[in-house]
Amino acid sequence: MFGKKNLKWLGVVATLMMTFVQLGGALVTKTGSADGCGSSWPLCHGALIPEFFPIDTIIELSHRAVSALSLLMVLWLVITAWKHIGYIKEIKPLSIISVGFLLLQALIGAAAVIWQQNDYVLALHFGISLISFSSVFLITLIIFSIDQKYEAAELYIKKPLRRLTWLMAIIIYCGVYTGALVRHADASLAYGGWPLPFHDLVPHSEQDWVQLTHRIMAFIVFTIIMITYIHAVKNYPNNRTVHYGYTAAFILVILQVITGALSIMTNVNLIIALFHALFITYLFGMTTYFIMLMLRSVRSDKQ
């Protein structure tokens, strides 16, 4: 059960399941299904199996089921990884983070159901689960030795790119929070047209301010990633990890901006909104991979 031969498929399945957790959370919020099981948790309407199954109950129950299965799968993965490749420096801390933040995400989700938290607290939910996803994602990359391929093993990231990448990670995370707040505050269609309602630029409600803040953060995210991408490909032209990685990040942020704009233009089409959540999930995952490589460069400085 915990054999080394299981590591690769466990990593892939756990990463996919964590992706579905992210998308499921976005689906619950977008469809207003957070109260699909009433104020009961872990039961649904006070029962293990509810009497009726309206669509919001099905969506909420499905999200809970996927979250529970993902916890079991992540536990299986981290125990197996700890046992067989725990000698790799990053595996143990990543294992602790992945399980710890997944449990924290579940607790915040439960608190939201039972005590009806305010929007600003609920917006933390997506970001916390994103940290857990990224930890599982990194464990999977290590299992497949991606961190040793494409000149990654001999890569030394200098201070300018380190600073830009840290800034990129912080700004993305702030953008994630404001995006989650847009969903929870029911502000997806606030503040008029995209990119700005030029006929009336002054926000008139809390929802307008939430939406405007997210658009400003999205613009900053795009700008910082573009600057980081240009710096990376210009200064590391012969390193495929940097070239491919930061190019992928730049493509993902472009797709993120496009789906964000289309969400508004289509009155929040559900499929587009889910792609919007998917792209930011993998963009943040890519950024944490850069951070892992950067921390290795920092350790080499100290040796």
UniProtKB/Swiss-Prot annotation:
It catalyses: Fe(II)-heme o + 2 A + H2O = Fe(II)-heme a + 2 AH2. The keyword Disulfide bond applies. Residues 1-8, 89-93, 147-163, 237-244, 292-303 are cytoplasmic. Interacts with CtaB. The N-half (TM1-TM4) and C-half (TM5-TM8) domains are connected by an intracellular loop. Each domain is formed from four-helix bundles and they align in a pseudo twofold symmetry manner. The N-half domain is the substrate-heme O binding domain and the C-half domain is the cofactor heme B binding domain. The cysteines of disulfide bond Cys-37 and Cys-44 may be involved in transfer of reducing equivalents from quinol in the membrane to the active site of the enzyme. Its main location: membrane. InterPro entries: COX15/CtaA_fam, COX15/CtaA_HemeA_synthase, HemeA_Synthase_type1. GO terms for biological process: heme A biosynthetic process. Pfam families: COX15-CtaA. Heme o binds at residues 63, 125. It is a multi-pass membrane protein. Heme b binds at residues 214, 276. This is Heme A synthase. Residues 30-67, 115-125, 185-215, 266-270 are extracellular. One of its GO terms (cellular component) is plasma membrane. Keywords: Cell membrane, Disulfide bond, Heme biosynthesis, Iron, Membrane, Metal-binding, Oxidoreductase, Transmembrane, Transmembrane helix. Its EC number is 1.17.99.9. It comes from Staphylococcus aureus (strain bovine RF122 / ET3-1). The chain crosses the membrane at residues 9-29, 68-88, 94-114, 126-146, 164-184, 216-236, 245-265, 271-291. Catalyzes the conversion of heme O to heme A by two successive hydroxylations of the methyl group at C8. The first hydroxylation forms heme I, the second hydroxylation results in an unstable dihydroxymethyl group, which spontaneously dehydrates, resulting in the formyl group of heme A. Its cofactor is heme b. Disulfide bonds join 37-44. The active site is at residue 60. Belongs to the COX15/CtaA family. Type 1 subfamily.
